[in-house]
Every structure is written in C-alpha cells, then in structure tokens.
C-alpha cells in the first residue's frame, strides 16, 4: 500500500461545494453529525482514502470478510448548494500523519473547487455540561462574524485538534 491511496469511485461535477468534515474524535460528535447528514441527504460515496497513517486495524463486514480502515468522501448536490462530506473510520495515529492526510483532504477540496470548509468535532472539558453550545474557530474575522449570527461562540486561547487544522 502507498502512504496514501485515493480511490475515486465515481466522477461527479459540483458547483463550488462546501466541504464538511466529521471524523472520529471526542464523543464522535463530528462523525455522528456527518453520518446523519449522509443518511438524510442520501449522499453518494465518491472517494475512498486508505493510508498507513491509520491504525493497523480491519473492520468485519456483514458477510464476515474484512476491510481496511478508510476514510470516505460523499457528494450531494441541489440547485442551491453542493456538498462534499468527509468522514471515515479513523484519524491518523501520528502527528505527522495528521498533516499529511490534511494535505490530501485539501487537495481533494481544491480539485472540486470547494468554496468553504467546515470541520466538526467534540470539545472535551472533563465533565458533563448542562447547556450545550457550539464553539467555533475561523480563519477570517468576516467568517467569525457570520458564524456568530448563527449562535456560534468563540473562546480565546483554546487549543484545537485535527478538526481545526482544516479551517
């Protein structure tokens, strides 16, 4: 296997899609959200990504055979909005692998002319919270203001993981 193998399952044309990433992480929040989106929208799997940066594990399929860990990209299109949805089994097991895989994810985004990327993930604070909220980070003041209009909160000096590398 190559360091990263990208298998294109189907070619699709999208118009300046928005990319949404939800990989396993704290509480599997991002993964659960995008899996729900994929199911509700009937998004179509178009890419499989394999890498030796994923844990050396296999998953047992319904028929009893196994498959390697992988991440996947789904596409969905409507007259008003096109989406690319990135999800999968694992994140990288190394710090270096996070950056290498992120570069490939961004290559995919560039190939499709992605207009914006949102990454989703949980935020561990060490205890249960009474009131849930959405905490964000962005790469421009304009995007911060736009997200604030939707109730997203921003916290100074907070660390972030892979879900923030993509932004």
Summary of predicted features, one role per range:
Residues 1-89:
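N-terminal short beta-loop-beta anion/metal-coordinating cradle
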Residues 65-163:
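Glycine-rich phosphate- or other oxyanion-binding loops that anchor nucleotides, phosphorylated ligands
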């Amino acid at each position: 296997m190559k360091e990263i193998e990208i298998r294109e399952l189907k070619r699709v044309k999208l118009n300046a899609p928005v990319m949404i990433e939800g990989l396993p992480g704290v509480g599997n929040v991002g993964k659960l959200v995008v899996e729900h989106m994929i199911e509700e929208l009937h998004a179509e799997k178009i890419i499989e990504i394999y890498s030796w940066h994923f844990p050396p594990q296999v998953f047992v399929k319904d028929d009893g055979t196994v498959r390697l860990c992988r991440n996947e990209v789904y596409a969905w299109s409507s007259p008003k909005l096109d989406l690319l949805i990135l999800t999968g089994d694992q994140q990288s097991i190394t710090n270096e692998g996070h950056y290498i895989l992120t570069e490939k994810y961004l290559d995919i985004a560039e190939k499709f002319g992605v207009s914006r990327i949102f990454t989703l993930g949980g935020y561990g604070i060490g205890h249960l919270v009474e009131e849930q909220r959405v905490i964000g980070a962005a790469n421009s003041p304009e995007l911060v203001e736009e997200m604030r209009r939707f109730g997203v909160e921003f916290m100074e000096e907070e660390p972030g993981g892979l879900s923030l590398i993509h932004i």
